[in-house]
Amino acid sequence: MPRIIGIDIPAKKKLKISLTYIYGIGPALSEEIIAKLQLNPEARAVELTEEEIGRLNSLLQSEYVVEGDLRRRVQSDIKRLISIHAYRGQRHRLSLPVRGQRTKTNSRTRKGKRKTVAGKKK
């Protein structure tokens, strides 16, 4: 398994797919990186030379925000929204959907397991 910026990527998968195992790199960004470094997108990750891995590491560290840095940035953005009392920050704080989805029904993923409340007496 080749190690790129501290992450083991799958060796037997094609390079385009292997790069998506790095947090912050999706299919489109993966293709862009491969084109920028002029690598073969059909090649398997195990076929990369040490020199190509080095170029890939240096490009990812210099030009892209990925893995731990990206996770920290997302968390700090959420903390900032909460601290300035923005609507989105309040939704994050209350563990409710942030982007305007309905909450009368659904939104179970965000709210968590159902909490039973006593029914109305007749």
From Swiss-Prot:
SUPFAM superfamilies noted in UniProt: S13-like H2TH domain
GO terms for biological process, alphabetical: translation
Top-rank taxon, per record: Bacteria
Annotated region (Disordered), positions in chain: 93-122
GO cellular component: cytosol; small ribosomal subunit
Pfam families on file: Ribosomal_S13
Record's keyword terms, sorted: Ribonucleoprotein, Ribosomal protein, RNA-binding, rRNA-binding, tRNA-binding
Keyword RNA-binding assigned: yes
PROSITE patterns per UniProt: RIBOSOMAL_S13_1 (PS00646), RIBOSOMAL_S13_2 (PS50159)
Biased composition range(s): Basic residues: 101-122
InterPro entries assigned to the protein according to its UniProt record, in alphabetical order: Rbsml_uS13_C (IPR027437), Ribosomal_uS13 (IPR001892), Ribosomal_uS13-like_H2TH (IPR010979), Ribosomal_uS13_bac-type (IPR019980), Ribosomal_uS13_CS (IPR018269)
Gene Ontology molecular function: rRNA binding; structural constituent of ribosome; tRNA binding
Subunit structure: Part of the 30S ribosomal subunit. Forms a loose heterodimer with protein S19. Forms two bridges to the 50S subunit in the 70S ribosome.
Family from the record: Belongs to the universal ribosomal protein uS13 family.
Function description: Located at the top of the head of the 30S subunit, it contacts several helices of the 16S rRNA. In the 70S ribosome it contacts the 23S rRNA (bridge B1a) and protein L5 of the 50S subunit (bridge B1b), connecting the 2 subunits; these bridges are implicated in subunit movement. Contacts the tRNAs in the A and P-sites.
Protein name listed in UniProt: Small ribosomal subunit protein uS13
Name of the encoding gene: rpsM
